[in-house]
UniProtKB/Swiss-Prot annotation:
Residues 193-516 form the Asparagine synthetase domain. One of its GO terms (cellular component) is cytosol. This is Asparagine synthetase [glutamine-hydrolyzing]. InterPro entries: Asn_synth_AEB (IPR006426), Asn_synthase (IPR001962), Asn_Synthetase (IPR050795), AsnB_N (IPR033738), GATase_2_dom (IPR017932), Ntn_hydrolases_N (IPR029055), Rossmann-like_a/b/a_fold (IPR014729). PANTHER family: ASPARAGINE SYNTHETASE, ASPARAGINE SYNTHETASE [GLUTAMINE-HYDROLYZING] 1. Its EC number is 6.3.5.4. The active site is at C2 (for gatase activity). GO terms for biological process: L-asparagine biosynthetic process. It comes from Asparagus officinalis. It catalyses: L-aspartate + L-glutamine + ATP + H2O = L-asparagine + L-glutamate + AMP + diphosphate + H(+).
Length: 590
């Protein structure tokens, strides 16, 4: 991942303004520690903090067309860039960067080229010939982007909120799958798949078609000129990512540079479900496995840094981001710059445990659509920013456009969870990789119950967070919560604690509105709470809150006094430590 910042039409082309843009761009330097670039054209500034993944030697940004009349700064990866270059034989390229093709596509097709891009991206393109600009964000918001407006009429775009929040009168999240044009001064949706309008699909389930689509998605993401690995929690999604990567690595260009030995990474409290399952999967696949331990106190000590980097006060996101944030730092210290991860599967296939209660296929499908549309505010935000905080890139094959087209066209009746028929959550995905002759995974891993990342790293992690928050948030503070925080009022002491930290870093009113709110049970949308009357009394985002579904569900339901932080158990804090169970099998260096 890289960091981009653009300031356009600021009515100030002075040296002081240039210095200010450079200062703000440096706030994004953690995202791209390899190179800093800035292009100024009059009162327009395009800056870039580069994490060099493709063509590290010559792919510095901003990038240009042949006569430098078109300038582009990009955060992301374009997996089909070689194919796109072949479609433009008359154009000359300065670098081997996958992102350079964007400038040339604009020359040929104007603003109507974005849907040709296969990848994850946010970009700002300045057309100096016509004195205009366009900005766009990938289909579901894998890469973050914010847009803001200054009192002087300027438009600002930044990979993270911290790049523009102090200088804009108003700012907001740039909507995924959209393009913003200065010519119209408005957004236009460029990503319009059939599932987006929530029409119920009817395609029959074909396990081999689904398997092939996912394998293709993983193979695309092996495009790299730097060392890489996979995040492996031992759950279904990350295990499939690891299994498919291990199976296809040998024939890839990446193997020619870095060898065929795949590295896998896992984090958790000692004895956590994820650590045990991940180690078993790693042994089965033959990966070089790196296991990192953290304590509850390690996580608590990192909370402020996590909220600063993730830029949210959402409870679920912070719970899950903290272990990932700690793990990303250790991964980067090994010389690895890119990892492949399993985000998106639960949204596409209805993998969260509350989907057991979906009353019919129509409600099931509508909820998956709502979840995918909201991914950019939750799991995409976490996966991108928790890793980018340390200059590490995360790629997510489940959110491949072509794979989503296949998966979301399946009749949702096939996705429905029906224990009487032996169909647990994500059955269609499990069945697609249940190969008796050439197995991808052991059966008990392939059919392991869903764990949310914040649960799987160790159940005492969430309990410890609640106990810590209870020490810092009093009952009197909770009584005044609605007056202090009228928007997205925190209803638990844990939520109040995170909100206090967030407001210290991002006090602007616009910042508060970038974070989603509303009731949730086990990561559901507010609409899905209607599926079970009991859920309205136990609104906790943990998967264990799905009463009657999770093997380790809260039983009995937590009293409201505990959910607000009262009477929580004391946590014994151990000396922080991180353990490498497996050392690298090959030398990895930056």
């Amino acid at each position: 991942m890289c960091g981009i910042l653009a300031v356009l039409g600021c009515s100030d082309d002075s040296q002081a303004k240039r210095v200010r843009v450079l200062e703000l761009s440096r706030r994004l330097k953690h995202r791209g520690p390899d190179w800093s670039g800035l292009c100024q054209h009059g009162d327009c500034f395009l800056s870039h903090q580069r994490l060099a993944i493709i063509d590290p030697a010559s792919g510095d940004q901003p990038l240009y067309n042949e006569d430098k009349s078109i300038v582009v700064t990009v955060n992301g990866e374009i997996y089909n860039h070689e194919e796109l270059r072949r479609r433009l034989p008359d154009h000359k390229y300065r670098t081997g960067s996958d992102c350079e093709v964007i400038a040339h596509l604009y020359e040929e097709h104007g603003e109507d080229f974005v849907d040709m891009l296969d990848g994850m991206f946010s970009f700002v393109l300045l057309d100096t010939r016509n004195n205009c600009f366009v900005a766009a964000r990938d289909a579901v918001g894998i890469t973050p982007l914010y847009i803001g407006w200054g009192l002087d009429g300027s438009v600002w775009l930044s990979s993270e909120m911290k790049g523009l929040n102090d200088d804009c009168e108003h700012f907001e999240v740039f909507p995924p799958g959209n393009l913003y044009s200065s010519r119209s001064g408005s957004f236009r949706r460029w990503y319009n798949p059939q599932w987006y309008n929530e029409t119920i699909p009817s395609a029959p389930y074909d396990p081999l078609v689904l398997r092939k689509a996912f394998e293709d998605a993983v193979i695309k993401r092996l495009m790299t000129d730097v060392p890489f690995g996979v995040l492996l929690s031992g759950g279904l999604d990350s295990s499939l990512v690891a299994a498919v990567t291990a199976r296809h690595l040998a024939g890839s260009k990446a193997a020619e540079q870095w060898g065929t030995q795949l590295h896998s990474f896992c984090v958790g409290l000692e004895g956590s479900p994820d650590l045990k399952a991940a180690k078993e999967v790693a042994e089965y696949l033959g990966t070089v496995h790196h296991e990192f331990h953290f304590t509850v106190q390690d996580g608590i000590d990192a909370i402020e840094d996590v909220i600063f980097h993730i830029e949210t006060y959402d409870v679920t996101t912070i719970r899950a981001s903290t272990p990932m944030f700690l793990m990303a730092r250790k991964i980067k210290s090994l010389g690895v710059k890119m990892v492949i991860s399993g985000e998106g599967s639960d949204e596409i296939f209805g993998g969260y445990l509350y989907f057991h209660k979906a009353p019919n296929k129509e409600e099931f499908h509508h909820e998956t659509c709502r979840k995918i549309k909201a991914l950019h505010q939750y799991d995409c935000l976490r996966a991108n920013k928790a890793t980018s905080a340390w200059g590490l890139e995360a790629r997510v094959p489940f959110l491949d456009k072509e794979f989503m087209d296949v998966a979301m066209s399946i009749d949702p009746e096939s996705k429905m969870i029906k224990p009487d028929l032996g169909r647990i959550e994500k059955w269609v995905l499990r069945k697609a990789f249940d190969d008796e002759e050439n197995p991808y995974l052991p059966k008990h891993i392939l059919y392991r119950q869903k764990e949310q990342f914040s649960d799987g790293v160790g159940y005492s992690w969430i309990d410890g967070l609640k106990a810590h928050a209870a020490k810092h948030v009093t009952d009197r503070m909770m009584l005044n919560a609605a007056r202090i925080y009228p928007h997205n009022t925190p209803t638990t002491k844990e939520a109040y604690y995170y909100r206090m930290i967030f407001e210290r870093f991002f006090p602007q009113n616009s910042a508060r509105f970038t974070v989603p709110g509303g009731p949730s049970i086990a990561c559901s949308t507010a609409k899905a709470i209607e599926w079970d009357a009991r859920w309205s009394n136990n609104l906790d985002p943990s998967g264990r809150a799905a009463l009657g579904v999770h093997d380790s569900a809260y039983d009995p339901p937590l009293p409201s006094s505990i959910s607000a932080g009262k009477g929580a158990a004391m946590i014994t804090n151990k000396k922080p430590r991180i353990v490498d169970v497996a050392t690298p099998g090959v030398v990895i260096s930056t």
